[in-house]
UniProtKB/Swiss-Prot annotation:
Organism: Bos taurus
Superkingdom as given in the UniProt entry: Eukaryota
Active site annotation, chain numbering: H274
Lineage: Eukaryota, Metazoa, Chordata, Craniata, Vertebrata
Stated name of the protein: Aprataxin
HIT domain span: 182-287
Length: 356
């Protein structure tokens, strides 16, 4: 009995949990974050980031492997953010599984993954990877909605942004919001109060931070982390998601004069594949910056039908290189292609098209 006890104890002593920093667009190999060790990440050959706005020591990371999070300290001058909430120079916050760390200026998205390693004498190491973004270990963080997307709270006005006003001095609000979305879309899609429509295959919720008067997300119940995980086996599901999106438009916005688009972000920032159903008025206080606009009005936004055709022909979804650069393009009206210098001027310009 004592020998068995000692053997089990020996095995437990070599069981350890490790953390990895993973670039969402897979531009480079993942970076190991040893438990309680400080790791500096920024512009370097390792990250393949050449952007001069990103410092060589942009962030300081320290993994709390036993607690399941990473402490992130912004060291560089330009803003680092988590789920589009800016950390602030020399400020430190926690990065949870399911959240997306944007290294600088809401570019270069990273997520964290935890693995359990067990090393037994005379045996190879056994690893159990925990995917980020959900309580389901098969899922992985995957929309640069500039804020994380979930359903609206009960009683919310779908035409109003539910983001609270910015209070630079109130750091506690920022930190609270970082933790609140740690489970991504999974919680919202399973909350009956947030559901607009559901059937055996999909559920529809209103985007927590709508970028237009009408902005819904269609999500499959099946655990599909992102478009990269989609295969021909999912073709019927993709078609059903598209059909449900069109049904929601007819049921809830049938009298709207605005046209709609259905599509996916090329590099989403939240776990669980989701189809955007969005009206083209872009009349929302949540539409705040160039990244928001370009994520829906450049090739960064993949049309639903185009994705279906791609999967039908190639068996998978291919996203070309350089997608993050599209988010930095000049602001251009999606109706007449006129260039506008700022978001306020773009919004004022868009009003001219509403009456047409």
């Amino acid at each position: 009995m004592s020998n068995v006890s000692l053997s089990a104890s020996a095995v437990s002593r070599v069981m350890m949990r490790v953390c990895w920093l993973v670039r969402q667009d897979n531009r480079h190999q993942r970076i190991k974050l040893p438990h309680l060790e400080t790791v500096m990440v920024g512009r370097s050959p390792e990250t393949k980031i050449a952007d001069k706005k990103c410092s060589r020591q942009q962030v300081q990371l320290k993994a709390e492997c036993n607690k399941g999070y990473v402490k992130v300290k912004q060291v560089g001058v330009n803003p680092t953010s988590i789920d589009s909430v800016i950390i602030g120079k020399d400020q430190e916050v926690k990065l949870q599984p399911g959240q997306v760390l944007y290294l600088v200026n809401e570019l270069y998205p990273y997520i964290i993954e935890f693995e359990e390693e067990t090393k037994s004498p005379g045996l190879e190491s056994h690893r159990k990877r925990k995917r980020s973004g959900s309580s389901d270990p098969t899922e992985r963080g995957a929309d640069p909605e500039a804020e994380p997307s979930t359903g609206l709270e009960p009683g919310s006005n779908p035409h109003q942004c539910s983001v609270p006003p910015k209070k630079e001095k109130d750091a506690s609000i920022k930190k609270e919001s970082l933790g609140h979305w740690s489970q991504g879309l999974k919680i919202s899609m399973e909350d009956p109060k947030m559901q607009v429509y559901k059937d055996e295959q999909v559920v529809v919720i209103k985007d927590k931070y709508p970028k237009a008067r009408f902005h819904w997300l269609v999500l499959p119940w099946a655990s599909i982390s992102s478009l990269k995980a989609v295969t021909r086996e999912h073709l019927e599901l993709l078609r059903h998601m598209h059909a449900v999106g069109e049904k929601v438009i007819a049921d809830f916005a049938g009298s709207s004069k605005f046209r709609f688009r259905l599509g996916y972000h090329a590099i989403p920032s939240m776990s669980h594949v989701h189809l955007h159903v969005i009206s083209q008025d872009f009349d929302s206080p949540c539409l705040k910056n160039k990244k928001h606009w370009n994520s829906f009005n450049t090739e960064y936004f993949l049309e639903s039908q185009a994705v279906i055709e791609m999967v039908q022909e190639a068996g998978r979804v291919t996203v070309r290189d350089g997608m993050p650069e599209l988010l930095k393009l000049p602001l251009r009206c999606h109706e007449c292609q006129q260039l506008l210098p700022s978001i306020p001027q773009l919004k004022e310009h868009l009003r001219k098209h509403w009456s047409k």
